Amino acid sequence: MENLPAVTTEEPTPMGRGPVGPSGGGSTRDQVRTVVMRPSVSWEKAGPEEAKAPVRGDEAPPARVAGPAAGTPPCQMGVYPTDLTLQLLAVRRKSRLRDPGLQQTLRGQLRLLENDSREMARVLGELSARLLSIHSDQDRIVVTFKTFEEIWKFSTYHALGFTHHCLANLLMDQAFWLLLPSEEEETAIQVHVDENALRLTHESLLIQEGPFFVLCPDHHVRVMTGPRDAGNGPQALRQASGAPQGEAAPETDSSPPSPSVSSEEVAVAAAPEPLIPFHQWALRIPQDPIDDAMGGPVMPGNPLMAVGLASALADFQGSGPEEMTFRGGDLIEILGAQVPSLPWCVGRHAASGRVGFVRSSLISMQGPVSELESAIFLNEEEKSFFSEGCFSEEDARQLLRRMSGTDVCSVYSLDSVEEAETEQPQEKEIPPPCLSLEPQETLQKVKNVLEQCKTCPGCPQEPASWGLCAASSDVSLQDPEEPSFCLEAEDDWEDPEALSSLLLFLNAPGYKASFRGLYDVALPWLSSVFRSFSDEEELTGRLAQARGAAKKAGLLMALARLCFLLGRLCSRRLKLSQARVYFEEALGALEGSFGDLFLVVAVYANLASIYRKQKNREKCAQVVPKAMALLLGTPDHICSTEAEGELLQLALRRAVGGQSLQAEARACFLLARHHVHLKQPEEALPFLERLLLLHRDSGAPEAAWLSDCYLLLADIYSRKCLPHLVLSCVKVASLRTRGSLAGSLRSVNLVLQNAPQPHSLPAQTSHYLRQALASLTPGTGQALRGPLYTSLAQLYSHHGCHGPAITFMTQAVEASAIAGVRAIVDHLVALAWLHVLHGQSPVALDILQSVRDAVVASEDQEGVIANMVAVALKRTGRTRQAAESYYRALRVARDLGQQRNQAVGLANFGALCLHAGASRLAQHYLLEAVRLFSRLPLGECGRDFTHVLLQLGHLCTRQGPAQQGKGYYEWALLVAVEMGHVESQLRAVQRLCHFYSAVMPSEAQCVIYHELQLSLACKVADKVLEGQLLETISQLYLSLGTERAYKSALDYTKRSLGIFIDLQKKEKEAHAWLQAGKIYYILRQSELVDLYIQVAQNVALYTGDPNLGLELFEAAGDIFFDGAWEREKAVSFYRDRALPLAVTTGNRKAELRLCNKLVALLATLEEPQEGLEFAHMALALSITLGDRLNERVAYHRLAALQHRLGHGELAEHFYLKALSLCNSPLEFDEETLYYVKVYLVLGDIIFYDLKDPFDAAGYYQLALAAAVDLGNKKAQLKIYTRLATIYHNFLLDREKSLFFYQKARTFATELNVRRVNLPPLPLCGWAPWLAPSHPR
């Protein structure tokens, strides 16, 4: 302990978790002293080169500065370092090299959590760290701590290896845990922490919280209280003066030190080092001042415990019957163990056989304990504590039934439309006559098993034992024999003869198993012997009478046990003085006898507890050290008082002061056992954690008890609702030691209880199931092989890995060959169904046919087989045979009265009819299935019921009535919500979203259900779906057209943007940036529009995909092109960015589209001359692509531009070219209307621009013909008026003018136009050249 332990050897535990008992051991004058000095001295020992934290060459510097320079002591810093960087690495276990593929996956998950860090903060909270930031690009997490307790817990968890697995459980998906064993062992997630930074953080938090304990170079533990200016050397520290956190602290030497001693201590204390967090906590626990005088000083010496023989170093005369008298050189056999730092031990004189307490300082041990495990456990029975009553054989049976049980063997399987649609095309055809080699091998194995099946008994008996721990969940491994008598209240308790059975029983000279209940803290012995006593007061009086009878008869052992019992009863009622008298009498009755060592331990422990509570310093000095020696040195002693924990805490303080890791480990084990026995498991946590770390740091070989200890720790974490710590603890247990069968199954159970939802079968269990298989023995293990393989098959199938599931189920079939006919058939049916799910329906048909041919299935199994055969036949395209098989299955279900199977059979019939195109018949069968399902409990058939309702709703929306289909969708959603199945809820909501967006559009309902779907996507942690939904909801709000809706759309767009960034979906990200820019354009926030568009363009260019760039540039131009302001900005996006990309990539269609947009935009912006270039380009591209419609559009736009530029003849030419490309004959009214408009424009061009009334009249008449054909009266009125004017004023044809005028008047009357004028002057104003010359 000369150097501060590194991060891997710090074993902190939560300050508030352990029992609050007295601190320290006997007089702590030499154990804990006070050093008054500058705190910075603690770090002076480290030079600059030691203070710098090592940085790997391939790592970037931390994203956040965790603190000042490493070589600066915290007390000299302006800010205490409380931040820590966690570096996450994906490595290969054997070579320790990085795994680039897994590292990328890890970085992707970190990126997701960087956007939404709530789950990461939750996991780090379990590790007692506070999340500051995530830097996914550097694979780093920055955490901080605010208290010493937090850094203590975190460093403990990290040292135990929990941080690696906690973060792996969070960051890795379920597929990672389903890797094959070779792959699983190959890769791992590791969390690296800078040890120097962790040390500085720990020390700075210690300084912030007040005085703390340090180890000085003279190997003494002292308290660091403050700067050197506070005093001139070690000072006495009494009571709470300067104790850590204001608690009572150990007292130092009461006599003032001499100057020479003072200066020497100051000199040796030049470079003290803080104790590790666990020792800080153990010494901080408030102690009683009377403990100062107990047991003498603790001097650092031999830290090893000792067993076996010892030789006396000097003569010793015992001061009482319980103390051994011996002479120097005598041999003494130690009973149990001699614990360093304790002044007493129990021994037997080799020559005389006398047993008593021996002064540890007066003997020399011949057998020091070299192995830590031998110091922790003094016999084999103590090791059983970790697995005692935790996981019984019945628990294991129930677990395997839950894991391996499947409805496929007893309940008809529903033919899912989704599964059928995913069947491979070749498997829908008639199967080929010859199967591949692998299916042939499977079929051969099936036939072999069926042959063996015929010779097996129908209902074999399960083995009486699976070889698991024999302890049940509530029965101890040591089942004491109950006494064979029972005393009633009416008996004469003063007559020794009447009490002979009780007194003779209690007067046994040694320990018997039935005495365990007498010494136990709960006193179960009383309830078994004195059943008729309901009043404890009356019982105490009767026992007092029995005590008198024992005393009168001279039965000393009975007297001692009765006095002990009376003392316990008085102590329970807080009659401490009376209890002390009884315990003292019990001690006196023993007369130094150690025949019943457990009784001696119980008496001393209870008496020491009473003396401490009564503050009896003198008696404590005599009894407490001996009680501690008995508690630590006696193997498998019985916990007899709750105050035993205080004595063990005192022994732990002395072990820390004496720097004996073996004594510390023994004390931690006993404290953990004590608290677990008292149903205080959370108080045992710090001691279990410290025990595991002590064993790890000792370099001792792995042992079986370690696995059980980790699992006990995991069970306590589970009680504290720390699921990630549970999973990590279980994983570490499996990696550190080769677990037993019971331990592996116990691990599976813990994972099932603590795995995050919504995984009902978490993939993490696969590792422990395979471990259980590896631990099976050839004898009893054979019965478990089948259920374990079946459990693995169900697990892999649940997660969609049907290939490995088939392999495991095949092995389960082979392993269950002796399990009985029904079990074999069930396994074969399950195997066939897995082949169906895997898209191998022909193989499934062959397996099921083999079962049928063997004639071994029961009637209900025949129904299941018939239904499954029908499903497989349907998927291979044999509809008729499938219908026949469904009918057989339905008939079996009706004969057996199985309503659920009838409902599934009818639903399958409906799906088959729908597949065959008989939708009305399908609807009939589905309705019948719904009627049956509605009568069944949802717990049995909820998922199938939901699926059938969705199927029926889909059918109704297709063929009507659609409103009824909506009702079935809503019913399905209610059923899924009631049974709490998220996947079913998601499917139902998706159907409702489609219904309200496509079948019966409703914007409000569509938004509501999309938002519900979004919440469900968050529950199942599907980020891809979540991003898509956010994008869709944004579009929905955008379509509402209100400012509030636009702001909501912007919010959803930004959320989707964050997800797309995390998922590295660059295309989606670019579109999201652009969508946000579009919404800002609608909200008229112009300064943000350009910014978001620019970022979108940068993202598109980052991908290096010119097609994406082209799409983005065009879409950016569309924002302005479709808007009402700043439309000129669209020109640069179209002309300068998108069009060159379209030319470069050879995308002629995009080039044509852009040219058309530019022509239209430039025409609107009054720049027809510039538009001509793009109009000609559009025309050329249209001709090249053979697109007649776009060619006609191009000619039309060219004509319009030429018209605007005043080029009448060119405009006439292009209009005529456009008309020549129209369909002939005309098909639609729109085409006729186009003729009307174009001929009108041509007439105007000829009349006004080319000054040719005659040709203009011709175009007008063509327009009139089209208008008459169309029946457009307004157009006819307009054209008739024009013709009347031309013929009246310019062509001077009065007859035609009158005709056209009358026609115009007729349409004017019909259209309620009051007057039709033929004024020549306005026309002359429009076209001066048309004005007639005056007569001369």
Swiss-Prot record:
Q: Which domain of life is it from?
A: Eukaryota
Q: Which portions of the chain have biased composition (kind: Basic and acidic residues)?
A: 46-61
SMART domains the record matches: SH3, TPR
Q: Compositional bias (Gly residues) spans?
A: 18-27
List the PANTHER family: SH3 DOMAIN AND TETRATRICOPEPTIDE REPEAT-CONTAINING PROTEIN 1, SH3 DOMAIN AND TETRATRICOPEPTIDE REPEATS CONTAINING PROTEIN
Q: Which residues are recorded with the post-translational modification N-acetylmethionine?
A: M1
For this entry, the protein name equals SH3 domain and tetratricopeptide repeat-containing protein 1
* Name of a matching Pfam family: SH3_1
Query: Which residue intervals correspond to the TPR repeats?
Result: 560-593, 601-634, 665-698, 786-819, 863-896, 946-979, 1027-1063, 1192-1225, 1277-1311
Q: Where is the composition biased (Low complexity)?
A: 62-74, 247-266
Task: PTM Phosphotyrosine: list the residues.
Answer: Y1248
Species: Homo sapiens
Enumerate the PROSITE patterns for this protein.
SH3
Matching InterPro entries: SH3-like_dom_sf, SH3_domain, SH3TC1/SH3TC2, TPR-like_helical_dom_sf, TPR_rpt
Annotated SH3 domain ranges read: 305-368
UniProtKB keywords: Acetylation, Phosphoprotein, Repeat, SH3 domain, TPR repeat
Return the annotated region ranges for Disordered. Answer: 1-76, 225-266
